[in-house]
Amino acid sequence: MPVPKAAGNLDPVALETSLIELWNEENTFLHSIENRRERDSPFTFLEGPPTANGKPGIHHVISRLYKDMVCRWKTMEGHVVERKAGWDTHGLPVEIEVQKQLDLMSNEAIEAFGMEAFNQKCKESVWTYEQAWREMTERMGFWVDMDDPYVTLHDNYIESAWWSLKQMFDKGLLFRGHKVLPYCPQTGTSYSSHEVAQGYKEVSEPAVFIKFKLKDSIASILAWTTTPWTLPGNVGLAVGPEVTYCRVKVTAEPSSSWEGRGGAEIGEELILAKDLLGNVLRHKMEVLEEFPGSDLIGRNYEPLFPGAVDGSNSNAWTVVGADFVTTSDGTGVVHTAVMYGEDDYNLGMKEGFPAQHTVGMDGKFIEGTHEKLDGRYVKECDSDIIDLLETTGKLYREHIYTHDYPHCWRTDHPLLYYAMDSWFVKMTAVKERIIQHNSEVEWAPEWTGTKRMGEWLSNVKDWAISRERYWGTPIPVWICEKCGSEHCVGSVEEMISMKTDDSPTPPELHRPYVDDVKLNCNNDNCSGEMIREPYVMDCWFDSGCASFAQWHYPFENKEKFEGVFPVDYICEAVDQTRGWFYSLLAVSTTVFDNVAYKRCLSLGHILDKDGKKMSKSRGNVVNPWDHFNLSLIHI
C-alpha cells in the first residue's frame, strides 16, 4: 500500500485524512483480518459498549487509542484480530434522558404517558449520536466493525442474557430476597454494591445524640446517628453485651460554650459506654454506676415518635444485644430502624421488631409519621426532626459530621438504604472461585487486580440484579399466582412453549410485551398461571454478558464462541474495575466457572481543570472535534 506524500511542509491533518480515505477505499481493516485467516492464530478483543445517547468525549478517544494500538500490534505480528463494536442501550442513562425530554419526572408520569410509548422513545434515543460516534471512530483511525455490532436491546442478545440467568437459577445462584438496598427515590430503583461504589461523595451534615427514656427508670439511654430521618422509624436499641456502660448524673452546665441545639437538666441521668464518656458528654457529670451491656438487655423505653410505628404485638422499643456494636464512635448504643439499614434489618428480624416503613418509595415520609413531616422528602427534614426532638427534651446535642455517603451515580442525589424485595445472584457462594479467576487475569497495572479488584472481591456481596424500571432486559422469572412456584425462562422457545393459550406472542423481548405473557404453571399438581416478575435487569448484567451474548450463544455460533472465549484483551478506564470488569468476571464465573478475559489494561481518568473526572453527567467533557483538526491528539 503506497503511503501518500504530503506536498511541501508536513501537514499532519492532511496526512491523517488521506490515510483514512485510502484505508476506506482499499478496505484495509477487512483485509487485515481476511489475509491472516489461514494462519489460524486469533487474538481476541472485546469492545466495552458505550451508550450512543450521548456524544463521545475526549476520554473515549484515549481509551480507543490504547485499544487500537494493541490490536494493530497483534495484527502486525500475524494474528487474526476481529473487533466487533458494541452498544450499551438499556438502563437509567437512557431513561433519564428521555424523562427530561418528555418532562416525565416520576414513575407515575411515565405510566400515565404509557410504558409502550416511553420505551419506544428510549429505543429511539439510544441512536441519537450514533453518527457522531461513527465519525469520531473513523476520524481517529480506530479500526472496529461498526456495521455488525452487538446491541444489548436486540432480541438475540436478550435471549442469551436470559439463558445465562437460567444457568444461575438452575445452580441455585439466583434467588428472591427481602434485603436493605441502596435506593434512589428520584429514579425509583435500587442499586447493586458495585454501582454504589462509583458514587460516594464527601458530605457534611447533622449528626445527633438522642435521649431514649427508659420506662423503668428516670435515666435515658444515649444513642448517636448520622441519619436523623431514620429516627421516626426507631423500634430498638442495640448494646454490646460485654461492653462496660455507665449511668451518670448531670451535676453542672458545660464549662465551654454549647454548639448547636440540645441540652440536659441538672440531675438528669444518662447511660452510655464508659469508653466514650469524654467524647460525648459536654456537661459535668457524676458516675453513679458501671455495669455490662447485658444488664440493659430486655429493658423497654419510650418511643421517640409515638404513633409513627405500630408497636403492638411486637418487641418494639426494647434494648437488645448485638455483636456489631463497638465503642469506636458514637455512644456504644446503636439506634435501630429495621427498614433502613442492613444490620438493623437483620437484627429486627431476629428480635421480632416491627418491620414497617415510615418512608415511601418516593423518599417522603408517609402519612401518620408526624404532622410536621408527612409527605415531605426525608433529607429535607433533618433540621425539623432535630427541632421536634429538642422540643420534647429528647435531644442531648447535635454536631456537623463529615463523611463519605453514597449518591446516585446518574442523578447525583443521596441514596437511601431501604428494605425491599429484589432478585439476587448469590455471589457469596462463588467468592473463592471469582477470587481465583481474578488471580488468573494479567492486569496492567498489576495493582488494579491485586488491590482494587482483589480487595473488592474479598468483601463481595450478593448482586442485586433486578431494577424497578421500564427500559431494560426483562427478568425472565415467572411466579405462579396459585401455588407460588418459580420458573426462570432460558429462551424464547421455552417461553412460547409454556405460555397460556390466551397469551399473545410478544413482538419483541421488552416491556410491556413480555409482561402480557402468562405461563402455565410448571408444577404438575397445579393448574394456575404464572405471572412475570415486573423487573428489568441491572444494565451492568447486560454488558457483563457481552463475551457470549454478542454471538447469540448458545443458540448460534457455538464453535465461534468457544474459539474466542475467554477473550485475550479488554481495555477501559479504572472505574470499570467495579463496573464492566466486575460484571464480566461475575457472569463468567457463575455461568462458565471461568475468566471472561485473559488480560486487562485499566486506564487512568482524564481530569478537568478542577481535577475532577470528566463525565457526561457533570457536563465537563471535552469535545474531541475541538482538537482533531488543530493538533495531533495522540500526543
Task: Briefly describe each language-model feature range.
Residues 258-261, 542:
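Glycine-biased, low-complexity coil/linker segments
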